[in-house]
C-alpha cells in the first residue's frame, strides 16, 4: 500500500512538473516582458540572459550610422553583446557625471498562444533611451516564447534594430557597436 501511494504521488508530481508545468498563457507572457523591463532598468545582464532558453537563436538586422548589418547569435554571443551594451551604458553614464538615465519601454503588438499552450509568438516593439536625446535604440521583433519545466523562456527572436544618437562629447556609439 505504501508503494502504491508513493507511486501515485510521484506520478502526480511528475505530471504537474512536466505536463502542467509547460502550459503557457497570456498572463505569463506579459509577465515575462514586464520582468525583462525590470531587468533592463536594474541593468542586470545576467538576469536577462537567464530569460533565454539554452537553444536561443537571434537573427538581427541593425541600422547604425546609415549602415545595415545582418547577424545571428546563439545564447552565449547574445549574452556577451548584452553585457557589452550595459558596460557601454555604464561608461557613458560615468563620463556624463551620472546624469544619463536609461528609459525602456515596450509594446506588445500581437500575442498568439499556440493551440497546445506550450509556446507563443509575440510581435513586440521596444525603445531604449539613454539620456533622452543622447542615444535611442528602437527594435521591432518577432519572438518565440516557451514554457518548459515551469519556466518561461525566450527561444527565438527575429529583430530589426535602429540606433540613433546625438553626436557629442561623451562617445561615438557607432564606433563602439560596429566594432562589436
Predicted stretch roles:
Residues 33, 52-54, 62-64, 124-128, ...:
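A mature extracytoplasmic/lumenal domain signature
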Residues 2-54, 58, 62, 66-72:
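Short, low-complexity N-terminal intrinsically disordered segments enriched in polar/charged residues
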Residues 132-180:
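Low-complexity, intrinsically disordered terminal/linker segments enriched in charged
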